[in-house]
């Protein structure tokens, strides 16, 4: 019987050790840099977009729903509130919450508990000049300083496009590496585009052909769209122009489409095949340039 008892105690001890290791590894995994933490949030939609952080805190617990998986929200002129509990973080590293794909989110505000009960507020979004963001970047970045279990609140606005929030937890080193990597590849892409633009302009000067003029316009609009869409424009080229930063991706897309129709019209010599199609392509191209 003593042998059996010792065996049972041994198994219990082993199970306890495995449980402790499992909890430790789970905690470490929860704080791993680079992890997408959107499924760990809970959300509430404010239909009017007027609720303050204090009013949100007074909501009943069942008003918040678990995110569980990536979702898209049609909130019109309302606001989406996300509640995220800070996991156990390595205090030796600085941590940030990154709103990926948020280069053209209208407004993103993070509320974190501060000293004396006051809220520490961090602002971003293309309705605010990038130069006035708490942490100017291509996309909204928020610092996390709270202890494990601290609840932070992220308020998001976006009209008229839907919201598809994607939150990533990153330490300072990973954040800087991802910035450097993305800017390197964007620089390579834009550098190649500028080379193509230069060669197109050389052909315009050499031949004076309208095909090359249309091609130069198309490449220019394409580069402008990429600069605006990726957030490089707001960060480097127009950091104090929020209205332009908000409208630029849509405008450049319209102009890109119009320039593409113009280029196809010229390169295919459409006037030789159908005067009706030629006039239609001309009107459609002009509409794209003048509609904004």
Where are these regions (language model features)?
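Bacterial N-terminal signal peptides that target proteins for export
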Residues: 2-15
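Flexible inter-domain connectors and hinge/loop segments
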Residues: 10, 94-98, 141, 156, ...
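Bacterial N-terminal signal peptides
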Residues: 12-24
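Short, flexible coil/linker elements and helix-boundary hinge sites characteristic
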Residues: 22-25, 58, 237
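Compositionally biased regions
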Residues: 26-28, 286
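Soluble non-transmembrane domains of integral membrane proteins
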Residues: 29-182
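Juxtamembrane segments at transmembrane-helix boundaries
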Residues: 188-292
């Amino acid at each position: 019987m003593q042998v059996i008892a010792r065996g049972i105690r041994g198994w219990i001890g082993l199970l306890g050790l495995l449980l402790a290791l499992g909890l430790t590894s789970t905690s470490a995994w929860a704080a791993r840099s680079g992890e997408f933490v959107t499924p760990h949030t809970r959300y509430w939609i404010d239909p009017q977009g007027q609720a303050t952080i204090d009013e949100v805190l007074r909501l009943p617990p069942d008003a918040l729903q678990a995110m569980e998986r990536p979702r898209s929200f049609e909130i019109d002129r309302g606001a989406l509130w996300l509640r995220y509990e800070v996991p156990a973080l390595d205090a030796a590293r600085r941590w940030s919450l990154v709103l990926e794909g948020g280069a053209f989110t209208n407004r993103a505000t993070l509320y974190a508990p501060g000293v004396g009960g006051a809220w520490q507020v961090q602002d971003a979004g293309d309705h605010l000049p990038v130069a006035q963001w708490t942490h100017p970047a291509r996309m909204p970045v928020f610092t996390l300083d709270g202890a494990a279990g601290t609840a932070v609140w992220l308020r998001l606005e976006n009209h008229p496009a839907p919201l598809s929030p994607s939150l990533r937890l990153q330490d300072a080193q990973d954040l800087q590496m991802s910035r450097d990597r993305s800017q390197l590849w964007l620089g390579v892409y834009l550098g190649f585009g500028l080379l193509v633009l230069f060669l197109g302009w050389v052909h315009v000067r050499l031949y004076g052909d309208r095909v090359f003029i249309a091609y130069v316009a198309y490449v220019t609009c394409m580069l402008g769209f990429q600069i605006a869409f990726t957030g490089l424009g707001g960060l480097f080229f127009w950091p104090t122009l929020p209205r332009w930063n908000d409208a630029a991706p849509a405008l450049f897309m319209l102009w890109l489409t119009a320039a593409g129709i113009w280029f196809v019209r010229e390169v295919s010599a459409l006037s030789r095949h159908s005067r009706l199609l030629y006039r239609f392509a001309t009107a459609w191209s002009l509409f794209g340039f003048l509609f904004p």
